[in-house]
């Protein structure tokens, strides 16, 4: 089995082709065709949630598939919109709900909400990316986490956003070598440490973000090996273009001993 580090690189180095492969999957093709054919027919929140197939596609596109059953909850979020800073969606710590409501902003645009690109092809693009990440996770959870972090990182504005998102938190804790038990510490203490050790502005620089994710995937593999330690080291030494130095490898080997 290919290790986490290499698996991530194979997908990320040509994300366009990776997404094309997802788009050509028969199930994805059928669901996407249905979505695009029907979304512009939706004129209200009631109609939106009534079409379960359509609604589930939209929810999955925003990483909320597990909440597709909670229609009353989502109706409340949609009815409140995002214009009012005190709206239900804006008050939720999980930003995915706000993003969803912003995409399908019936509160602001009424029966024209689904005519915007973000509700049509924009949602399809998100669905394809979400499916790509989920497919990767079926083989290796570390790859899914890396792809998710890559997608979200540039929009992170503070450490609390990392802590509020389980996937972002998992990546940050792993990359920083923090034990899961640290998650039980006072939330302000957690945020302070993260902001001391990570310059969030670095995530707006593709090269610096890549280095951070490379560190995560390598440490994830050490903690959750898909291949032997010897094979991992051999693979990394033969992949110099990915920027893992000998010193970093030696450091990570010593970390494994603890």
Where are these regions (language model features)?
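Type III/flagellar secretion export determinants
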Residues: 1-258
